């Protein structure tokens, strides 16, 4: 083993992993931190890595790439896993894995490592990504190898090796937290009883609907080829647009869900997720599609969406089948242009208007008044032909 590239967050787990790799593999460890909008202090992360004698430190701002090339393509499909989950963690892993492999090539490393546990989905997502990008890469997953099986053992290891442990990490935390620009998730510990209501003071992106503004807020989102491009007619970059929607949605208590999901490894897991901006985008995108997509095209998208969501959730972003579905989805978005008006209030996203130069909606046809383009008597033959099999059951 020549050199290892570690996906490094600067937290207790990956700081211990960093030292453990240095001790057990006797080779140089390169650290890579992806700034995906998680609001961590990147200078502190650099200081922690430097204190552990790391010579090559890569801390990269990938927020725009994350939203433009991963989040937006996913939202073109109106992607939801098991009815609720907008895949905030799942969609971040392919980008981290890709860049980790690129850094391995750049630095001459033959091995990559991650801090995902042996029970979760992330170990699969990371490693599927690694092997798709470099089939010959070596992978180290410390949580599947070492004897440190509890948080207390991690803390003891850290203290023994002079790794700084913040005071608030010296006791058992109530939740395991993952964050990026799309969402923040809370899992484990007190949430492991699915009947116990969580302490919502932990929320970082949102307030609960009870504490949300008492005044509704109206916003407009513009779309070009299925992607949002402006809020209230002000053009914004992908990352800035999502960031602004998070701020707007958060103060109205939008996008807080409490779910029990089915992990790929076969375990049911309960989580609290905050996705304010993504929830607004999902409603807005569905609304603009409702007037710009043909019925059969829209229904076909609805049919393939669960398969597409499952591929992303299970870590198959870089596969041929996901790319095939993406090509179909992207083709459907060529005329998904226009503006959607929404009302945000106490946890609700209400579509109150939509318009498009590519609209397929005909007021003349939809009206209850008589129409020259639609003869009511024509419906009789349509009904008789389509009811033939029903009358012969």
Curated annotation (Swiss-Prot):
Positions bound to L-aspartate: 117, 121-122
Class in the EC hierarchy, top level: ligase
InterPro entries, alphabetized: Arginosuc_syn_C, Arginosuc_syn_N, Arginosuc_synth, Arginosuc_synth_CS, Arginosuc_synth_type_1_subfam, AS_cat/multimer_dom_body, Rossmann-like_a/b/a_fold
Binding-site residues for L-citrulline, renumbered to this chain: 85, 90, 121, 125, 176, 185, 261, 273
EC number: 6.3.4.5
One GO molecular-function entry: argininosuccinate synthase activity
Pathway(s): Amino-acid biosynthesis; L-arginine biosynthesis; L-arginine from L-ornithine and carbamoyl phosphate: step 2/3
Disulphide connectivity of cysteines: none
Principal subcellular localisation of the protein: cytoplasm
Catalytic activity line of the entry: L-citrulline + L-aspartate + ATP = 2-(N(omega)-L-arginino)succinate + AMP + diphosphate + H(+)
Cell location: Cytoplasm
Record key words, sorted: Amino-acid biosynthesis, Arginine biosynthesis, ATP-binding, Cytoplasm, Ligase, Nucleotide-binding
GO cellular component: cytoplasm
Biological processes per GO annotation: argininosuccinate metabolic process; L-arginine biosynthetic process; urea cycle
Binding-site list for ATP: 7-15, 34, 115
Entry's family note: Belongs to the argininosuccinate synthase family. Type 1 subfamily.
Quaternary structure note: Homotetramer.
Protein's name according to its UniProt entry: Argininosuccinate synthase
Protein's organism: Ehrlichia canis (strain Jake)
């Amino acid at each position: 083993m020549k050199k290892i590239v570690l996906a490094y967050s600067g937290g207790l787990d990956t700081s211990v992993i960093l030292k453990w790799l240095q001790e057990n593999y006797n080779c140089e460890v390169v650290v890579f931190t992806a700034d995906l909008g998680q609001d961590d202090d990147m200078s502190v992360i650099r200081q922690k890595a430097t204190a552990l004698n790391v010579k090559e430190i890569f801390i990269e701002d990938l927020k725009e790439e994350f939203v433009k090339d991963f989040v937006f393509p996913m939202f073109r499909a109106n992607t939801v896993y098991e009815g609720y989950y907008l895949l905030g963690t799942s969609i971040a892993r392919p980008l981290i894995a890709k860049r980790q492999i690129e850094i391995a090539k750049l630095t001459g490393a033959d091995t990559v490592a991650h801090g995902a546990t042996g029970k979760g989905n992330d170990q699969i997502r990371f490693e599927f990504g690694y092997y798709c990008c470099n089939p010959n890469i070596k992978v180290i997953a410390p949580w599947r190898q070492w004897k440190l099986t509890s948080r207390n053992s991690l803390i003891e290891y850290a203290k023994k090796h002079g790794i700084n442990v913040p005071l608030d990490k010296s006791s058992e935390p109530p939740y395991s937290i993952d964050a990026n620009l799309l969402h923040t998730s809370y899992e484990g510990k007190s949430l492991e009883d699915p009947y116990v209501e969580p302490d919502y003071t932990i929320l970082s992106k949102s307030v609960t609907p009870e504490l949300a503004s008492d005044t509704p807020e109206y916003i407009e989102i513009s779309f070009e080829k299925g992607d949002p491009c402006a809020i209230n007619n002000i053009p914004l970059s992908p990352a800035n647009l999502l960031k602004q929607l998070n701020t707007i949605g958060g103060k109205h208590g939008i996008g807080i869900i409490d779910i029990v999901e089915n992990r790929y490894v076969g375990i049911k897991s309960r989580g609290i997720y905050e996705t304010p901006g993504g929830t607004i985008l999902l409603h807005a995108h569905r609304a603009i599609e409702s007037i710009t997509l043909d019925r059969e095209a829209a229904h076909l998208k609805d049919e393939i969406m669960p398969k597409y969501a499952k591929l992303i959730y299970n870590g198959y972003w870089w596969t041929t089948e996901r790319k095939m579905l993406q090509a179909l989805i992207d083709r459907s978005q060529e005329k998904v242009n226009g503006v959607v008006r929404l009302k945000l209030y106490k946890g609700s996203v209400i579509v109150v208007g939509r318009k498009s130069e590519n609209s397929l909606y005909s007021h003349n046809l939809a009206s209850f008044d008589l129409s020259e383009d639609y003869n009511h008597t024509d419906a009789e033959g349509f009904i008789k032909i389509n009811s033939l099999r029903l009358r012969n059951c």
